[in-house]
Amino acid sequence: MKSLHDLIEQIKNLEKELYEELQKKQEELYYNIQGKKVRFEKAARRHHKTLMTHVPAYILHAQLRNILTVPFIWACLLPALFMDFVLTIFQTICFPIYEIPRVKRSDYVVIDRHALAYLNIIEKINCIYCGYFNGLIGYVQEIAARAEQYWCPIKHARRVANLHSRYKNYLEYGDAEGYKKKFKDIRNNFDDLTSEPDN
């Protein structure tokens, strides 16, 4: 039976393999990444423009249910912006006090699909929204995970659907002696993050 450490190493190796496969896809789809910019070859970009659905046709063929739900989707934006603001302030003030490395927002909130030439303006706005919102959820989860490691690094008894990055460091549920002995060490152990720069 594999240990937890072995499984984590296996996951890291699979993530590295996935990254290598994604880089191969970049070559197949004629683009490369320079810093934070994605650059397509000119021929690929020209071809993409021919595949774009223009706005009038896009609206004409949109399903009614999609049109009717737009206000509900966009109503989520204000609470999301507020949460982004509050948690950024929280980690800016509290994490240095707790000696927790800050979460780099740009590692989670990635907005780049608006540069795709085969998307019309509505699709680009939708992609900006989804990139922001999903990235924000990852950013918030990482802030919460680091705060949880500091305040309550105990695994749950029940299975959790989506384990965050810090969960592997937590103490077992019901391990009272381990909690008393190891809490302070675990609370302050962010050694695996010390190479990450601040925002």
Where are the language model's segments positioned?
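Compositionally biased, charge-rich terminal segments
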Residues: 31-76
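Short, non-transmembrane cytosolic segments of multipass membrane proteins
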Residues: 1-44
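Cysteine-centered metal-binding/redox modules
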Residues: 57-199
